[in-house]
Design a protein with these regions (language model features):
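N-terminal small-domain helix-loop-helix segment of the aminotransferase-like
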Residues: 2-98, 105, 286
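Conserved core of the PLP fold type I
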Residues: 63-193, 210-211, 217-226
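Short Gly/Ser/Thr- and Asp/Glu-enriched loop/turn motifs at secondary-structure junctions
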Residues: 89-90, 322-327, 366
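PLP-dependent enzyme catalytic core of the Aspartate aminotransferase-like
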Residues: 337-339, 346-355, 361-397
Length: 398
């Protein structure tokens, strides 16, 4: 049976499908008619092999408690070896309902109330939320933009913050959302050496690991045995195959003591088995979804290149940060001269777009907008045209 869902130009009406991306604009304070390109949720049909596997399981008609069987791990291990050159062991694996849930469990497992947790702003905003919501202190070693139009790590500041704030836990984002960096082995080794030296546990969010367009994704835990011993690696099929509603993530913790502490917090939270449909979807994705994945990856890369060309040609004063990984483009509007409030008004009310405002990723994100380009080209073109027209009208009125 051949893969059927390879038409990524196909525009699908997702309204009235209980879709967070499309159905909850008004509830979230947005105009009803906005075009949404905000949350990291692709507008593509997933692999037909996943669809078929879910339908076949649903036909069984019984949805009792479930657990994984050996093929699940073998399929997962094959994917990690093939795509990320990482050989995992079955006892490392812990399944959770999502990566953000795993971040919260890690905060509880490896820190005490009042402890400092390090992040690198601008970064995926739930990082800050799960730290603060669990009574810990957020400490940031901010990334900085270089002349090469990429973000970089200030390693001196990174270690200084760890020492001065007595940091216990570090949230690494690789690839980094929203700035699109894929950290090199050299950069990761510098981070890891500092964390090992100072007794810092590393939670590495690698959920976007299958979206790399420049460079090579390196699993942090795979680089050195010392890094493996201090790391919690968070992965999921939810981004790669657009399965967020399946509520399943695969967390790898090689260190037995770190694993024991993590499991203890899972037990305290009352989590046990995950839903059978998530398990079925994951097995189908990683065992039969390769053709779909490769085609989707190529389509998204073409959209990224198209966006770059469009911005350079039609949006003076706007810059697209060099994107190495993720399908989330980081647009810099600071040279337009618009204030944060004016930019928000331009995007939301004039362009009628629902993007992710840079300010939600921290103060370092002010003046930026994050746009999801994992959508049909027609949708992306419409969004970019709306920005162009809104910017033109804004300049004429000044």
């Amino acid at each position: 049976m051949a893969e059927r869902n390879l038409d990524f130009d196909k525009v699908i009406n997702r309204k009235n499908t209980r879709c967070l991306k499309y159905d909850f604009a008004v509830k979230r304070g947005k105009p009803a008619d906005v075009l949404p390109l905000w949350v990291a949720d692709m507008d593509f049909e997933t692999s037909s092999y996943i669809e078929d596997a879910l339908v076949e399981r649903a036909k069984e008609g019984i949805f009792g408690y479930s657990e994984v069987q050996t093929p699940y791990f073998e399929i997962l291990a094959n994917w990690m070896k093939l795509h990320h050159n990482w050989e995992i062991q079955e006892d490392w694996l812990i399944k959770t309902p999502g990566v953000v849930f795993a971040l919260a469990m890690a905060v509880k497992a490896y820190t005490q109330p009042g402890d400092s947790v390090l992040i690198q702003l601008p970064v995926y905003y739930p990082f800050s939320e799960v730290i603060q919501d669990n009574g810990r202190k957020v400490v940031s070693s901010n990334l900085y933009q270089g002349e090469d139009n990429r973000y970089h790590i200030d390693f001196q500041d990174f270690e200084k913050k760890i020492v001065e704030e007595n940091v216990k836990l570090f949230f690494l984002c690789n690839p980094h959302n929203p700035v699109g960096r894929v950290w090199s082995a050299e950069e990761l080794e510098k981070i890891g050496d500092i964390c090992v030296k100072n007794g810092v546990t590393v939670v590495s969010d690698e959920i976007h690991q299958d979206f790399v367009f420049k460079g090579k994704h390196q699993v942090f835990a795979s680089l050195k045995k010392e890094f493996q011993d201090i790391s919690i690696t968070c992965t999921s099929p939810s981004k790669t195959f657009n399965l967020a509603s399946m509520m399943i993530s695969n967390i790898f913790i090689p260190n037995p003591e770190l694993r024991r502490k993590f499991r203890k917090e899972l037990d305290a939270a009352g989590t046990s088995q995950l839903g059978v449909l998530g398990l079925v979807a994951t097995e189908a994705a990683y065992s039969k979804g390769e053709e779909w994945y490769q085609a989707m990856h190529a389509y998204v890369e073409a959209n990224i290149n198209y966006t770059k060309e469009y911005v350079e040609k039609y949006l003076p004063g706007v810059k697209m940060t060099d994107l190495e990984g993720t399908y989330l483009v980081w647009l810099d509007f600071r040279e337009t001269g618009l204030t944060v409030e004016e930019l928000e008004d331009l995007i939301l009310n004039k362009a009628r777009l629902w993007l992710d405002s840079g300010k939600i990723f921290g103060k370092a994100g002010e003046g930026f907008q994050r746009i999801n380009v994992a959508c049909p080209r027609a949708t992306l073109t419409e969004a970019l045209e709306r920005i162009r027209k809104a910017c033109y009208c804004s300049l004429r009125s000044q």
